[in-house]
């Protein structure tokens, strides 16, 4: 949601934000790779332009709940000749397709919240719907989108229970505050406006996070 609100086109927002707000689709994050963990910009997951679609090959690791997700936002290398922090794009991929597979990573606790995610000649259309590009932000500038999203996540975490959700789960917010049938955000234009207002609130979250951390 935050990446689309900041970098998404109007068409991307109208297509994706309403079902996100209603809790109808679940996303996972495809950043880390087996050989690109702390040095994320060295990622090698390759995305080739094939005219009317993208062809993705590579692997991601530590993908939280990838086996239960509907979509994944992935950092891919679209220009192998560019410098390390450039030539990376931020792409949205449907998990339910040929060429995309997951393998849960079993932890010592016996639980498997993380997965390996594989892309083997995975085909992603240039547009998921008319005018709805698979790429978020500018081509080869996905690093900017990723940095913004990581910063946003840290601010939400630092705010703790005093954040936008007030300590509640996303499902509870969707059911009680938004509603799946007659929700307040059934109007997609209102979804976009509400998201933009939330972004304006981020500086306040940053201050709240600092105050909370000082008390720890």
Predicted regions located by residue number:
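N-terminal glycine-rich flavin-associated loop
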Residues: 1-11, 37-40
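Residue-level signal for inorganic ion chemistry
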Residues: 9, 91, 119
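A short, Trp-centered hydrophobic/proline-enriched beta-strand micro-motif
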Residues: 23-31
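Short Gly/Pro-enriched turn/cap motifs at secondary-structure boundaries
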Residues: 35-38, 62-65, 80-82, 106-113
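Structural signature of FAD isoalloxazine-binding scaffolds in flavoprotein oxidoreductases
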Residues: 39-43, 124
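A structural signal for short hydrophobic beta-strand segments in well-ordered beta-sheet cores
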Residues: 45-48
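Glycine-rich beta->alpha junctions and the first turn(s) of the following alpha-helix
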Residues: 100-216
């Amino acid at each position: 949601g935050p990446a689309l609100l900041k970098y998404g086109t109007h068409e991307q927002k109208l297509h994706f934000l309403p079902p996100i707000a209603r809790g109808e689709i679940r996303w996972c994050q495809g950043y880390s790779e087996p050989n690109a963990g702390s040095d994320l910009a060295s990622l090698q997951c390759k995305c080739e332009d094939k005219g009317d679609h993208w062809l993705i090959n590579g692997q991601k690791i530590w993908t939280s709940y990838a086996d239960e997700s509907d979509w994944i936002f992935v950092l891919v290398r679209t220009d192998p000749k560019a410098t390390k922090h450039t030539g990376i794009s931020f792409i949205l991929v449907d998990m339910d397709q040929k060429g995309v597979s997951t393998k849960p990573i079993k932890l010592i606790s016996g639980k498997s919240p993380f997965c390996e995610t594989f892309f083997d000649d995975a085909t992603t259309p240039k547009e998921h719907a008319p005018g709805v590009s698979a790429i978020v932000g500018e081509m080869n500038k996905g690093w900017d989108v990723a940095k913004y999203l990581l910063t946003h996540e840290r601010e939400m975490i630092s705010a703790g229970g005093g954040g936008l959700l007030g300590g509640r789960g996303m499902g509870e917010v969707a059911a009680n505050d938004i509603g799946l049938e007659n929700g307040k955000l059934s109007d997609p234009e209102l979804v976009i406006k509400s998201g933009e207002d939330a972004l304006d609130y981020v500086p306040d979250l940053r201050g709240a996070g600092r105050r909370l951390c000082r008390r720890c």
